[in-house]
């Protein structure tokens, strides 16, 4: 076989063209100190803020302090075997976590790795944990409800899709219980839920996961865990990871609800990291940017308009708005809402549900204080029937609290005051609700209708809850069609009012409570 020079030169050219060599220039640095999970690195001149730094042993650190001649980074994972002189490399990318419907029903850590023993997740997409929140033009006003299933919340402090509603109170006042019930109530509402547990005991988290599974809500929920035994870095990053998972649904025209339980522990973890990085401490030893820590997280909870969703999905989803509703939880010390972190989060959110120890200990559960709890934007999203009927509930409770304090000093009260006190006591009793027993729109509307139209006047105080239970079971047995109609539409008109009146009159005639 003879080859001429042209063929040889063509063959060589072909080989050269198909030869593929990839050269990758990566920044390299050297560890100069390791202490308390913080490493100082010499070199890495063009590292970014928040960049992932690759360490020996398939671990990563997060660059947080960019100084003149060194980089301060926090290690995500064990650091006992890291030594001075070890080589590290910059990755050129910031932290990303897996996102998508594959995560529903799973328990993951801050990095999106499964920790529930159910095998790999197989998510098809990842998303950066730090994303800039949608701008003003991309947002739409809140006008659709998120039903928590609690009478006291849905009637007096309504929450809308895309709202940020703070749940605040001392330890052991039922904050987590309220949030978990809100998640359970979404199992058939089409709203996906994300529960982020920060700095909690592993046994507490396991109990929450079991309850969600028992009530059939885990299949629509992602649980993100940074337990008390995890490093401060993972506790600090967990809310951002959960938020990225929630934004996946928001940006595709779906609705999601995220619970941060709780942001006080995240702030403490961030304080720990900041002090170890030698950042100057401020009030309560928190760093100066602790407000920004929470504001950039909570601003990502929003309702986005149709144009935003269409642009994001490149025209795949048309005519749908998306929302991410946030329920951040803050733990106060002895009811002190004027501390640094509580005041910050109150000023960022669109309202707060304040839970009081005194009410909780008095058996009023959920222990919502209607006097200082407020929803700034939820009124527009409230179900029409509940909005129409519940106007007098807050007023009755506020007047009752005022009169109850006044009545302690006076024995001879006039009839009108006595009536108001009795009505207030009965409404307070009626607002009580058991855990894991969320109520439908119809159930809430019926109970509030009975209270507002004076049907409780001849019911003894200790029989109010029995009256409620009997009324609801009677309604379900005899007025199932009306119940289905109200649950579906939430509408209220003269015809529905007449039917509700007939229902309660018929029930009272039976005297079966």
From Swiss-Prot:
GO terms for biological process: proton motive force-driven ATP synthesis. It is a peripheral membrane protein. It catalyses: ATP + H2O + 4 H(+)(in) = ADP + phosphate + 5 H(+)(out). ATP binds at residues 169-176. F-type ATPases have 2 components, CF(1) - the catalytic core - and CF(0) - the membrane proton channel. CF(1) has five subunits: alpha(3), beta(3), gamma(1), delta(1), epsilon(1). CF(0) has three main subunits: a(1), b(2) and c(9-12). The alpha and beta chains form an alternating ring which encloses part of the gamma chain. CF(1) is attached to CF(0) by a central stalk formed by the gamma and epsilon chains, while a peripheral stalk is formed by the delta and b chains. It is found in: Cell inner membrane. It comes from the Bacteria. Produces ATP from ADP in the presence of a proton gradient across the membrane. The alpha chain is a regulatory subunit. This is ATP synthase subunit alpha. The gene is atpA.
